Amino acid sequence: MANILILGAGAMGTAFSFPCSDKGHSVTIIGTHLENNFIDQINLTRVHPILECEVPKKVIFLKLEQLAEQINSKGKIDLIVVAVISKGIEWASTELGKALKNEIPILILTKGLAINDNNYEVLAHKMERLMKKNGIKETNISAAGGPCLAKGLANKIHTSVVFANTNITVAKQISKLVTTDYYHVFTSDDVVGVETCAAIKNIFSMAIGASQGLCHPST
């Protein structure tokens, strides 16, 4: 059994707790600074208002002020999962930079691309750069990509994803933690390729869908 901490109590962060819980892991979800009321509501009803389903009984929901305590004081955390919106990566990097004292593997579920010095930057590289600015010398960050919808994952609909890390061994270790009979994980050492495809896939799907629609009468 592993101890997994998820930063972000939104749809995808909570949905990711389902395969983690099904594998028997201890899962703690820490809300962002904007999710305090959200956390109170979930703890009261045990229903996630966006996913519209009950959350696993063993998953613990806590507020942001308990982040450092959970990381450093309550046993060993084996994996930190970042599940915030793309604009929140800088915030998450700062919060983790303040809380982390030891190197812990990090998995980013967030999709998107950033700009740094007029160049595109994948989010794993952005987080590495920002955390080093915050004094974290060694980082071990993996990125997830794939057509995975939060509600589908929470309802255990089959889906396939890719975990990428320049150290393929780390990606494989994380995949073993969370792979289930409905959440299928492949691995890659191409972080830039996986993150870029994850960020722009919807552009291509919209273009393909629109071109197919041109063959049909307007309704």
Locations of regions flagged by a protein language model:
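Internal alpha-helical scaffold of NAD(P)-dependent oxidoreductase catalytic cores
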Residues: 99, 130-140, 158-219
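Rossmann-like NAD(P)(H) cofactor-binding subdomain of soluble oxidoreductases
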Residues: 61-62, 66, 74-157, 174
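NAD(P)+-binding Rossmann beta1-loop-alpha1 motif at the extreme N-terminus of oxidoreductases
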Residues: 1-54, 59-66, 116
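Structural signal for hydrophobic packing residues in well-ordered secondary-structure cores
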Residues: 11, 20-21, 46, 50, ...
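Conserved residues at beta->alpha junctions
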Residues: 33, 83-84, 165
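Generic structural signal for well-ordered, non-membrane alpha-helical segments
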Residues: 9, 13, 35, 89, ...
